[in-house]
């Protein structure tokens, strides 16, 4: 049997909102398997649906860039929020985002690329920046979207300056490349930033995630004591709601609260082919520090 630690119980409680004793029991029943423990709590009606993202604590910036029918986005991490306001760091993120337009999404290829205006690579420039600023930094990930005929749009939420912020979205829309489509692309970016969908269409939903969800929903429905035929209908309705939560094209358009995203896109005579959403530090664990400690750490180099 796995050793159930206090940290595991705390983590499960943060993920589900369930009570401490319930979380401990769930971990004991599932031999310490965190994912199975979440499902166990949900089946018992002791937890809300699993949260879609991990704890976010890392600092740095998300940067976007455009050129013609392509748009790119990168995430560059640092240790403290102070660095995000550093001009040299901002310039580095902007440059790497622009490089991704031609180099592509592969982070190793990006690091090996020549840094514009210098006689060394992006990786070497990053080493130099680390030495100057005094903090560890890393290029975590990159994404590029491209269209044949249409608009590659982007949206940055809470931008410190144009193209730099903590949440970034890329959107690929095929259609007539005009101002109206560009506006729609930005609106979809805002929608994605707010609703955090996991998939573009129902066909893109991870089959294993869907099966897990169905199993949980069926168990919840059976707890009602209703006949199996009624339970099947209940599960169908809840699966539809699941799709509306996680599938972009099935979601309700945040800008009017009524239409489906798919209808909005179709009405514009366009096709939404891809979206990418980066949240700074998504899924990265970082030891919590108070503001005074962060100031002291920054001052001490």
UniProtKB/Swiss-Prot annotation:
**Highest taxon of the lineage:** Bacteria
Principal location = cytoplasm
Q: Does the keyword DNA-binding apply?
A: no
- Identify the Pfam families for this entry: EF_TS (PF00889)
Positions of the UniProt region annotated as Involved in Mg(2+) ion dislocation from EF-Tu: 80-83
Question: What are the record's GO terms for cellular component?
Answer: cytoplasm
- For the keyword Cytoplasm, the answer is yes
Under Gene Ontology molecular function, one entry of this record is:
translation elongation factor activity
Assigned keywords, A-Z: Cytoplasm, Elongation factor, Protein biosynthesis
Q: Which NCBIfam families match?
A: tsf
The record describes the protein's role as: Associates with the EF-Tu.GDP complex and induces the exchange of GDP to GTP. It remains bound to the aminoacyl-tRNA.EF-Tu.GTP complex up to the GTP hydrolysis stage on the ribosome.
Entry's family note: Belongs to the EF-Ts family.
- This protein is called Elongation factor Ts
């Amino acid at each position: 049997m796995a050793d159930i630690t206090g940290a595991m119980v705390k983590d499960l409680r943060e993920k589900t909102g369930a009570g401490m004793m319930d979380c401990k029991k769930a971990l004991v029943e599932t031999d310490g398997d965190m994912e199975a423990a979440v499902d166990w709590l949900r089946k018992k009606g002791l937890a809300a649906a699993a949260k879609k993202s991990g704890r976010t604590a890392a600092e740095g910036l998300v940067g976007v860039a455009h050129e013609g029918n392509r748009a790119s986005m990168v995430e560059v991490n640092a240790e403290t929020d102070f660095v995000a306001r550093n001009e040299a760091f901002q310039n580095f993120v902007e440059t790497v985002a622009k490089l991704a337009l031609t180099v592509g999404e592969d982070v190793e290829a990006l690091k090996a690329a020549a840094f514009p205006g210098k006689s060394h690579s992006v990786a070497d420039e990053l080493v130099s920046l680390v030495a100057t600023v005094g903090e560890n930094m890393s290029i975590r990930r990159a994404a590029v979207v491209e269209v044949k005929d249409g608009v590659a749009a982007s949206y940055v939420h809470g931008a410190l300056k144009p193209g730099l912020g903590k949440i970034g979205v890329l959107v690929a829309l095929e259609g007539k490349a005009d101002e109206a489509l560009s506006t729609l692309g930005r609106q979809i970016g805002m929608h994605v930033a707010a609703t955090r969908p996991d998939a573009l269409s129902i066909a893109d939903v991870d089959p294993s995630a869907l099966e897990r969800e169905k199993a949980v929903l069926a168990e919840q429905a059976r707890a009602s004591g209703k006949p199996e035929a009624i339970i099947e209908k209940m599960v169908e309705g809840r699966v539809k709601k699941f799709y509306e939560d996680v599938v972009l094209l099935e979601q309700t358009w945040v800008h009017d609260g009524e239409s489906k995203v798919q209808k909005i896109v179709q009405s514009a005579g366009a096709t939404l082919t891809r979206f990418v959403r980066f949240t700074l530090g998504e899924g990265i664990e970082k030891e919590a520090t108070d503001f005074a400690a962060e100031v002291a750490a920054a001052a001490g180099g």
